[in-house]
């Protein structure tokens, strides 16, 4: 197996169990439900059935992307372990999250010049994004190297 981290955003519509079973790391987006902020922790803080029931009952919800500082801390934990990173973001067509990831990448490349961070725009969302991550996990598990992105 290759020694790089395959990573994405929590918006890939995969369960925590699936992320773990495929060895895919993820960073959590944020959302607000009726004025209260939550981390998109895959249904731990607010179970999905409660979330959708709240929407059904007229709750307002909005999302916010991961910021550059959050990406920096997230990526740095892997870099300290001597790992390169292939991070695939939610589509740039619906989110600016790729910009936050790129800012963190540029900052960390100065501190860890021996490590590589690859940021890829999935151009997808939801289940399509999740399927793409599964395909990348298959490639990684079959010897794909991060620099072959």
Where in the sequence are the language-model features?
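Conserved small/polar residues in nucleotide/adenosyl-binding loops
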Residues: 148-149
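Short glycine-rich or small-residue beta-strand-to-loop segments that form or flank ligand, phosphate
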Residues: 84-92, 118-121, 135
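Acidic/polar active-site rim loop that often engages polyanionic ligands
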Residues: 113-114, 128-138
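Short Gly/Thr/Asp-enriched flexible loops that form oxyanion-binding sites at enzyme active sites
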Residues: 89-111, 131-133
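A short helix-to-beta-strand connector/capping loop
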Residues: 2-3, 21-24, 112-116
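Glycine-rich phosphate/diphosphate-binding loops that line cofactor/substrate pockets in enzymes
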Residues: 73-85
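N-terminal glycine-rich anion-binding loop in soluble enzyme alpha/beta folds
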Residues: 5-70
């Amino acid at each position: 197996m290759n020694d790089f981290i395959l990573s994405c955003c929590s918006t890939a519509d995969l369960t925590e169990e699936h992320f773990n079973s495929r060895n895919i790391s993820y960073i959590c987006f944020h959302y607000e439900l009726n004025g209260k902020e939550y981390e998109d922790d895959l249904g731990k803080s607010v179970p999905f059935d409660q979330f959708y029931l709240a929407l059904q009952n007229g709750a307002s919800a909005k999302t916010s992307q991961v910021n550059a500082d959050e990406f920096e801390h997230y990526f740095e934990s892997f870099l300290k372990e001597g790992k390169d990173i292939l991070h695939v973001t939610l589509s740039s067509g619906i989110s600016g999250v790729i910009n936050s990831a790129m800012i963190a990448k540029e900052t960390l490349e100065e501190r860890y010049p021996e490590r590589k961070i690859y940021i890829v725009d999935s151009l997808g969302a939801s289940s399509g994004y999740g399927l793409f991550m599964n395909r990348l996990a298959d490639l990684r598990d079959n010897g794909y190297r991060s620099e072959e992105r």
